[in-house]
Each structure stands twice: as C-alpha cells, then as structure tokens.
C-alpha cells in the first residue's frame, strides 16, 4: 500500500475486506506473521473441535471470532502461538446426518447397506462438511493453520485416543461392567448423561397395588413409566419415614393399603375411596423384608424371581411423596440399579437395544416399551391392582442429542473408565486451572465433577474410533487377561495379520478383522467404538500428534488456553479433565475461557431445525465482517449468553465509519506536505507539542493500559468499549476538531509538524489496537499510514505499550473538565439558538469545587476555542457571580398556615423579590423592605430560581468531584455579527468545493453577491479570513463556474466558485510577492 494514499470518502466494509483479503494473499500475511513470532515464547492454544455435521452458525462464528481475537492479541505480544484448528468428525452427529441423506430409519438399514459402505459415506460426508466450515471460518477473517487441521479421523489422532485409553488401563481404570445407561432406541447405542437433552412430555400417572404375599393388604406405588413394572424387582421405602396401614372402603368393600402417612388423603382421593381408617402405624424400617406378589406375574412368567426379589428394602432415593413407596427395577433406573447392586439382587432387563421387549417379557415380547404402556395399564386393571390411572402427567423426558428420539434406561454391558476411583485426583486437578469466569470452575464445573459417574466410553455404532481392546473367547472379565493396544506400531507388532503401521486405517473395517495370538490364545477385538467425547478429550496431545511425535508434547503440554461455550462444562471441559487425569494424572489445560450461547435478539435459543437463527453470512452481506466481529467482541465472553442485535451491529459499522474518517482526515495534508513520520516523531518534537497533543497522547497511554489489562483478564468487551470511546469521543469529537486548523495552515510550522506527529502516533497505535478485533479495517488504516515503511501487515506489529513519559493522568483530568464544560456550553448555545460558528462575547464558568476551578483556569484557551468565545471568566467555589440574580417561588400550602391573612401579601412580596444569592436571610431582608415588617421564612416555603442577565443562558455540568454551571453570553455586537456571517459564507463555499471534488490545495476564485447591504458590509470586513479559509485568490470575477443561491439567517446570498487557471494563480502569487 502507498503511504498517505487517498482512500474512499466513506467506509465500505465490502470494498475494504475484499481488498485486504487480496492483499493478505499477495504478501502471505499469515505466513509472515507466524514466521515473525517463530522465536517468541511458546503459547499452546488448543482449538475445541466443532462437529463437521453442518454449516457455521452464529454460535460457532462467535466462538471462532473470540479465538481469532485472542490469538492475534497474543501474537502481537510476542508469543509463538499454536493455532492448529480441529474438527470432530466421528460419532452420532455425523452418522445421523448420513442416515438422513440415505433415508435410513435404524441400524438394520445400515447393516443391510453394509458397515464398510456406511463408514465410507460417513467419511465422505465429514470431509465434505469440513471443507464448508474451513471456507466459512476463513471468510470470517479467522487466521489459523487451515492447511494442517487436526482431524479426529486421521490415524495419528486416533492413536492419540488409543494411547490415552491404554494409559488409563495401565492405571487399572478400565473395566467392563453392567450399568443403567441412557439408550437411544433408534440409534441403538448408549449415550452419556451429558448428551441427553430434555423436553416436556405427557405421560400416564398410575397408582398400583402390589399384593403382599404373607399378610393381608397391598403396598401402593406410583409411577409414570408403567412399562418398567414388567421388570420390577423390589419396592423401596424410607427407613425413617412413618407409614400406615389403612382399611379403605369403596362401594361397600374394604381393603388394607400400606403407604406413607403423609400421602394417605391424596392417594385415597385419587382412588375414589369413600372412607378409611388407620389400623396400623409403622416405620419404613419395620417393613423391610415384606414379600409381595408381582402385579404382572401371569403376563410375565419369567419376571425377576431371584433370591431377595419381590421384597421391601430401604433406599436413600425415597421421599414422602405420592405414596412414599417406590417401585424399583434395577434393570432400568440408575438409582434402582445401584441399590440393587448393593443388595446383590438380580438385574432383570427384558428390553433389547432397540427398546423392544425381549422374550423374557412374556406377553409383551416384540412390543416397543412405550407402546406397551396402555396394555400394561389394562392388564393391571384386569388383575385388580390398578388403584388409579390418569393420562397427561407432564414430566421432563430425556431424548437423544442427535436424533431427538426419547431415550430408555436399560442395563447393558459397557466399557467404562472408572473416574469414580480418581474423584479426589480430579477435584484436585481442577484447582490447577484458572477459569474465566472463576465461578464456572468453583460452582458449575466442580459440582458436575463431584457427581460424575463412571464414564461409559463404549458405543454400539460404526463411525468412530474402535475401542482397542482384544479379548480371548472365554474371557473371565479380568482386565489382566485383556490386551489394550496403544498405537499403530504396537498393533502391527502384535496382530496376526501383516499391516503397515504408516498406512493402516484404524476404523472398524480394518481392525475388526485383526486378531492377536499369544501363548496359543487368540484374541479378537470388541465390537464397540469410543464415545465421540473421548475423541475430543485427547485434543491437547492429539493436536501435537502425540504419541507419534514427542517433541512438541514435551515442550508445550498442557495447553495454555482453551475456550468454548458453557455447555462444555458437561462436555469437552469435562472429557479432557477425565481422560487426562485417567491417563496422566494431570489436568490438560491451564486456562479456560467459558462464553455463553448465541441467541436470537429476543433471547430465544437459535435452532436450525426450527428455522430460528441468524445466518452469519447474512450479517456479513448487510454490514460486513469487521462490524459483525466488533459486535460479537463487544459482548462479554465470560459465561453470559449473547443476544444478537442487528441494531448494535449497524452501530458498530457507524463507529468504524468514524474511525475511517479519523484515519482519512490527515492523509491528504501529510501527503501534500511530504510529512516523514520516521524523521519527525513525537519524541523529536516534545518541546513543540501543544497541550492538546500531550493530552491525546496521554489518553492513548491510558487506553492502552486499560485495554491490555482487560485483554489479559479475558474481558474483550471492556477493551472494545475503551477503544471505541477513545476513537469516537476523544479523537474524532475532540482532538480532530481542535487540531484541524493547525493542519490547514498554508506554511510549515513546528505546531503543524507536532500535530502531524501526534496524530500519526495515535492512528498507528489505534490501528494496532484494532487489529485483533477488526483485522480488515485495521490493515487498511495501517497500510495507508505506513505504506512500505511499516511491516507487511499490521498483525506483525507489537501490541502497544504504555510510554510513561507521555502519560499525564492529571492533564487528562483537566481536559475531562474542559469537555464537560464544552458540552454544557454547547447545550447553553442550543438553548439560545446560537450556532457554534458565531462567536460569543464571553463564557462564564461558575464552579463549586476548587479542583474544577483550577482546571478551567488552566485550560481557558481551549475552552474559549471550543466554545468560540472571546473570553472565559471563572467564578470560584467561594464566590458569587455578581450579574446573577435569584427569584423565589412561593408555596402557598406552606405560607397559608404560617401567615394567615397576610399570606397573600407575603407571596406577592416574594414573587417580586430579587436577590444575588440563594440565602433565606437575604430574601427575608428584601421582603422586610417591601412589607415594612419582619417575616420568618423556612426552606419549605420557597424555591429559589436562577435568573440570568438578558442574552445569557446557562447549563449545569458535573466533573471530577464537583461541577457547576456554564453561562454563555449570546448578546450580539456588530463585530460578532460580522465574523458570524463570514463563517456562514465560508461553510457554504467549502460545501461547493466538495461539489466540485477539488483537491485541498487547489485554489479558487469566488463571486459573492449579498442582497442585504448591511450584511454585505459585515461580510466584507472579513474578506481576508474568507479567502484564507477557502483558498480563494479573489472574491469577484467568476463569470461561469459553480453557482448557488443560499439563504443565510434570512438573507439571500449568491455564491459562485471556479478553479483558478494556472497562469492566474501564478500572476496572483507574483503580485502578492511584489
């Protein structure tokens, strides 16, 4: 880019971003930036891998934008940042998408299609989606190593999972066992608790009588899952709860029912009983050992009948709710299973992986379990044990996270990493990480880990990392007799078949056929694949291709930083902790940034399937990449959800337009004056810096310090706020306005050079400060300023550091007062309808604080300039402005009771009174003179009103620890009118210059005709000023040119302008030289 080259008048995101993309490609900006930091301190960032199951949405866009922002920031701080992106390419997220594409309904369709064919389809789909995501992320301006992403389907990554699993096995943390799991009947696989999503469903609510076997009466239970009664094994009671036996009457018949005392009324009401009598009181402990008959014994002949089945036991999960007795089926419910294990009871689960009853379910065999609910209820009724049944009871039901099928809980053989054996180690490792926000670690994450069950790592699916366990045919269940393979080299050495470890595909199609024979025993691989969360759990070492390569792992691990949304406390944050602790005993990450979800503007969650979403491509098309990024980064990244806002994104575009205009403003002047930033620096011109230069440079140091602190604390939103306020308020609305006339000076001067050097330093730093947030516009601004003299890209710049020599907080406080005074003065002008172009005779600043008074006195010149005032007067905190008066508004509700019949006279006197201070004593003296007698006034009786002299308006302000009032005297004098009209003419001529798109150096001739002779005379008094400001050689003699009629303060003015001919300009210059 050419230094100080002209740029477009308006910020056009599309044009800027297209140009910068092309520029980055031309100069290899990303590659050069990485090479520039190659010798810096290593920083190991690990990318949480998104599933390659769909296009980028606003959530992934926010996530990748945050990552890109911090990677760029860290590089600018000198770090050599690992930036390898990752993709989660296995598991149900991919499989279900492929099933949809192939119009499959269940696993049977897959088996008919062929496992290997299905695996190939999944591989192709995942790679296809990966390309789309890569394109999207690059299009958002994200800089990562897109040429070398880690893919969970690659052999070197898959063996990273194998290695971790083998390490866990060597620590005796791997076992096969039965557990109650969440089973998706459509996908026919177990899913983890953290993968279950919940929704409200209506279910039957039934009370059932379990007839006692050895005494009269029945136990009463309540359930919303009638289908699980088929597998009932015991009834649970609370040992300390009070239970009763009641004789309940209905239709003339009496039966004995046992239930919790607190539940009697509600249960009998549900059963429509006429009356009851309590005949027995006992505790839950006293009921232990009571035997009962299975309510579906005839329908399910092979029901649970093992030793101890069909009895009452105590359990911790029982509450005094419904009946106080809980039907328990260890073959289904998790708590039921755990209690059944403690009691060494039979685990009876007559349900297959597809949710269909097996032959063990007797009458119900071949029926999908939920479809059997009505039949079970009918049979219970037919058997005389249904006490009550009502439909539509709303409960939270779990469903598969990928296909939305309601899950069933069944007990199956699964492979587990027994994280419960290392719970203390897990909790201790959490303390070795810093979280942003910290409460996410100390509350949400710690609570989840404390309650985490053993990790079911096996899935009965196809597209995943095969579990590397080989077992003998008659395996005893002892893990010492199992072979767990940790990498490809070991696999090649141990299997019976001849394979090439460098090229072997580790997916099911290959490894299922591999056998191991040792000591005359042949081992075959178990058929399951890993839970897909185990894939990503090894990302910190999989990113650096460990164990295949060891050097980077030994130098970099554990990760310095990871960042994802808050759902990953139950997902990736947990799986990494669990796997790493199991494999290595250590936590795999040092810092965690946990952001929220991306929501719709009204707070609803986004959902592609429901058509409720914001497409990032649509945002880019409407507003551009940088405005979208800036909005996303202006939202806190620490734990809170983000509601997308079109309005705020548009506002970010407007603010970047202000940045654009600020950066564009000095370019033509610097170019015209051949300004050399390397030869003319702020340091070289320290003695020539004006006070406003020193202030803006100090503000730059304060902003840099605040932004650095915020970014180091992962508070990017605060950093954005600091930067935007600086550019919009400090630079655009204040500094540029103050300094522009110095840049317009015809002749070179130390003041002009100081202004150039100051603004150059500010803009160069601002470009660097914007770079992590808005990389495109930052690149454009930096290139326009530096050209070939700077780095090839702004992203190679160092992050700005605070220069203590330029930092003057005291001066900043003084200018803060100036700006508050200016704002108040501008408001007072507006009240008086006096434009800023028209000077005023004076501004009076009446303050109530010595600090504010000192600041105003120190900066009188700037205040006068900013408010276009001929003079500034300061009235100190202990003084009164002698020209100010106060009137008193009387409150008759207070005067009446105090003065009776004289209240009217007192009120009239008060209304006429004028005093010079807000003092009751002074007011009483004035009223005494009017009435000829003393009056005693209170604060409640009157309210003082400030009255300014004619032509003076005032506005209050606050600054530092005080404030005051700014009074503007707008009284007109002939001199003020003369300058005011001249400024109006100047503004019109400047607009006409813009119409002709004249270069700032191009001189013109002006023809001015004013209808009003007096106004014409006033304007002519400032001909020299007009000519200087608009670069006019003369104010007469334009025959053609650009001509316009203006109305100025009620007076018509005809103005014509035309560029001067070269010879005319030369003649003019020669004449002026003579």
Swiss-Prot record:
Q: Which biological processes are named by the entry's GO terms?
A: isoleucyl-tRNA aminoacylation
* InterPro entries assigned to the protein according to its UniProt record, in alphabetical order: aa-tRNA-synth_Ia (IPR002300), Anticodon_Ile_ABEc (IPR033709), Ile-tRNA-ligase (IPR002301), Ile-tRNA-ligase_type2 (IPR023586), M/V/L/I-tRNA-synth_anticd-bd (IPR013155), Rossmann-like_a/b/a_fold (IPR014729), tRNAsynth_Ia_anticodon-bd (IPR009080), Val/Leu/Ile-tRNA-synth_edit (IPR009008)
Q: What does the entry list under GO cellular component?
A: cytoplasm
User: Which keywords fit this entry according to its UniProt record?
Assistant: Aminoacyl-tRNA synthetase, ATP-binding, Cytoplasm, Ligase, Metal-binding, Nucleotide-binding, Protein biosynthesis, Zinc
Catalytic activity reads: tRNA(Ile) + L-isoleucine + ATP = L-isoleucyl-tRNA(Ile) + AMP + diphosphate
The protein's required cofactor(s) are namely:
Zn(2+)
Record's domain comment? Answer: IleRS has two distinct active sites: one for aminoacylation and one for editing. The misactivated valine is translocated from the active site to the editing site, which sterically excludes the correctly activated isoleucine. The single editing site contains two valyl binding pockets, one specific for each substrate (Val-AMP or Val-tRNA(Ile)).
What is the annotated role of this protein in its UniProt record? Catalyzes the attachment of isoleucine to tRNA(Ile). As IleRS can inadvertently accommodate and process structurally similar amino acids such as valine, to avoid such errors it has two additional distinct tRNA(Ile)-dependent editing activities. One activity is designated as 'pretransfer' editing and involves the hydrolysis of activated Val-AMP. The other activity is designated 'posttransfer' editing and involves deacylation of mischarged Val-tRNA(Ile).
Protein name as it appears in the record: Isoleucine--tRNA ligase
Species name? Haloarcula marismortui (strain ATCC 43049 / DSM 3752 / JCM 8966 / VKM B-1809) (Halobacterium marismortui)
* Organism taxonomic ancestry: Archaea, Methanobacteriati, Methanobacteriota, Stenosarchaea group, Halobacteria
């Amino acid at each position: 880019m050419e230094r100080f080259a002209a740029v477009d008048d308006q910020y056009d995101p599309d044009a800027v971003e297209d140009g910068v993309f092309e520029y980055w490609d031309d100069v290899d900006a990303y590659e050069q930036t990485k090479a520039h930091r190659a010798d810096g301190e290593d920083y190991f960032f690990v990318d949480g891998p998104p599933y390659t199951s769909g296009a980028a949405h606003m959530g992934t866009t926010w996530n990748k934008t945050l990552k890109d922002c911090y990677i760029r920031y860290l590089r600018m701080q000198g770090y050599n940042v690992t930036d390898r992106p990752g993709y989660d390419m296995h598991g149900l997220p991919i499989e279900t998408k492929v099933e949809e594409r192939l119009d499959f309904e269940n696993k049977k369709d897959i088996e008919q299609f062929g496992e290997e064919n299905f695996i190939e389809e999944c591989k192709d789909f995942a790679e296809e989606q990966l390309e789309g995501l890569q394109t999207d992320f690059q299009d958002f301006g994200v800089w990562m190593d897109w040429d070398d992403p880690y893919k969970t389907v690659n052999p070197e990554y898959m063996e990273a999972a194998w290695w971790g699993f083998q390490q866990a096995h060597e620590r005796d943390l791997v076992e096969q066992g039965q557990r109650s799991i969440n089973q998706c009947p459509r996908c026919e696989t177990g899913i983890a608790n953290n993968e279950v999503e919940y929704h409200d469903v209506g279910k039957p609510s039934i009370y059932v009588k379990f007839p006692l076997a050895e005494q009269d009466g029945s136990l009463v239970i309540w359930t919303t899952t009638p289908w699980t009664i088929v597998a009932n094994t015991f009834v649970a009671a609370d040992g300390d709860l009070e239970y009763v036996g009641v004789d309940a009457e209905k239709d003339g018949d009496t039966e004995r029912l046992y239930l919790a005392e607190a539940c009697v009324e509600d249960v009998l009401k549900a059963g429509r009983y006429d009356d009851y009598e309590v005949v027995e009181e006992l505790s839950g402990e006293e009921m232990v050992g009571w035997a009962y008959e299975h309510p579906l014994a005839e329908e399910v002949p092979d029901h649970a009948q093992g030793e101890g089945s069909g009895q009452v036991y105590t359990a911790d999960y029982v509450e005094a709710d419904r009946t106080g007795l809980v039907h328990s089926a260890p073959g289904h419910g998790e708590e039921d299973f755990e209690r059944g294990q403690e009691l060494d009871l039979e685990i009876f689960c007559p349900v297959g992986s597809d949710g269909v009853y097996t032959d063990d379910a007797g009458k119900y065999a071949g029926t999908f379990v939920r479809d059997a609910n009505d039949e079970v209820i009918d049979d219970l009724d037919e058997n005389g044990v249904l006490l009550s049944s009502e439909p539509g009871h709303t409960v939270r039901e779990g469903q598969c996270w990928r296909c939305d099928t309601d899950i069933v809980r069944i007990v199956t053989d699964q492979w587990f990493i027994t994280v419960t054996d290392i719970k203390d180690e897990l909790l201790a490792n959490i303390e070795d990480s810093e979280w942003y926000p910290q409460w996410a670690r100390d509350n949400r994450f710690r609570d989840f880990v404390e309650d985490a069950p053993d990790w079911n790592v096996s899935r009965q699916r196809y597209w995943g990392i095969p579990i590397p366990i080989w077992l003998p045919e008659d395996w005893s269940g002892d893990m010492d007799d199992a072979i767990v393979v940790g990498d490809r080299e070991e696999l090649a050495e141990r299997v019976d078949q001849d394979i090439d470890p460098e090229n072997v595909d580790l997916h099911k199609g290959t490894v299922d056929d591999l056998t191991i024979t040792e000591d005359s025993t042949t081992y075959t691989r178990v058929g399951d694949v890993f839970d897909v969360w185990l894939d990503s759990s090894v990302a910190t070492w999989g990113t650096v291709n460990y164990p295949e390569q060891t050097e980077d792992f030994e130098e970099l691990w554990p990760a310095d930083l990871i960042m994802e949304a808050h759902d990953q406390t139950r997902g990736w944050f947990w799986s990494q902790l669990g796997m790493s602790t199991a494999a290595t005993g250590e936590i795999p990450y040092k810092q965690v940034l946990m952001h929220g979800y991306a929501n719709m503007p009204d707070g609803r969650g986004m959902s592609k399937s429901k058509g409720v979403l914001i497409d990032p491509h649509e945002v880019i098309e409407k507003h551009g990449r940088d405005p979208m990024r800036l909005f996303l980064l202006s939202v806190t990244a620490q734990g809170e959800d983000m509601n997308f806002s079109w309005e705020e994104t548009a506002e970010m575009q407007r603010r970047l337009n202000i940045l654009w205009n600020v950066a564009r403003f000095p370019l033509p002047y610097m170019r015209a004056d051949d300004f050399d930033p390397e030869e003319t620096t702020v340091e070289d011109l320290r003695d020539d810096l004006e006070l406003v230069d020193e202030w803006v440079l100090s503000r730059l140091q304060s902003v840099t310090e605040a932004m650095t602190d915020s970014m180091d604390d992962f508070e990017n939103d605060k950093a954005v706020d600091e930067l935007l306020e600086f550019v919009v308020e400090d630079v655009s609305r204040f500094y540029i306005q103050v300094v522009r006339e110095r840049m317009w000076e015809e002749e070179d001067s130390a003041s002009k050079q100081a202004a150039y050097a100051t603004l150059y330093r500010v803009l160069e730093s601002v470009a660097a400060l914007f770079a992590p947030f808005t990389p495109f516009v930052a690149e454009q601004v930096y290139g326009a300023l530096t050209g070939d003299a700077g780095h090839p890209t702004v992203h190679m710049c160092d992050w700005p550091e605070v220069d203590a020599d330029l930092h003057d907080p005291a001066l900043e406080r003084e200018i803060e007062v100036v700006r508050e005074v200016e704002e108040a003065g501008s408001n007072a002008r507006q009240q008086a309808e006096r434009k800023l172009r028209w000077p005023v005779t004076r501004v009076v600043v009446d303050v109530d604080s010595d600090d504010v008074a000192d600041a105003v006195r120190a900066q009188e010149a700037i205040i006068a300039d900013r408010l276009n005032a001929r003079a500034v007067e300061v009235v100190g905190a202990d003084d009164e402005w002698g020209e100010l008066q106060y009137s008193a508004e009387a409150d008759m509700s207070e005067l009446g009771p105090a003065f009776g019949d004289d209240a009217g006279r007192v009120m009239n006197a008060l209304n006429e009174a004028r005093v010079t201070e807000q003092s009751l004593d002074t007011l009483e003296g004035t009223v005494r003179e009017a009435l000829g007698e003393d009056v005693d006034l209170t604060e409640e009786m009157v309210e003082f009103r400030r009255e300014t002299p004619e032509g003076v308006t005032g506005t209050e302000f606050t600054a530092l620890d005080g404030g005051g009032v700014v009074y503007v005297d707008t009284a007109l004098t002939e001199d003020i009118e003369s300058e005011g009209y001249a400024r109006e003419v100047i503004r019109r001529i400047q607009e006409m210059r813009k119409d002709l798109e004249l270069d700032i150096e191009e001189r013109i001739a002006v023809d001015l005709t004013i209808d009003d002779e007096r106004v014409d005379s006033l304007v002519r008094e400032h001909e020299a000023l007009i000519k200087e400001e608009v670069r006019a050689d003369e104010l007469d003699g334009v025959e053609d040119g650009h001509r316009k009629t203006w109305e100025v303060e009620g007076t018509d003015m005809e103005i014509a302008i035309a560029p001067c001919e070269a010879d005319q300009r030369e003649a003019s210059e020669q004449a002026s030289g003579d």
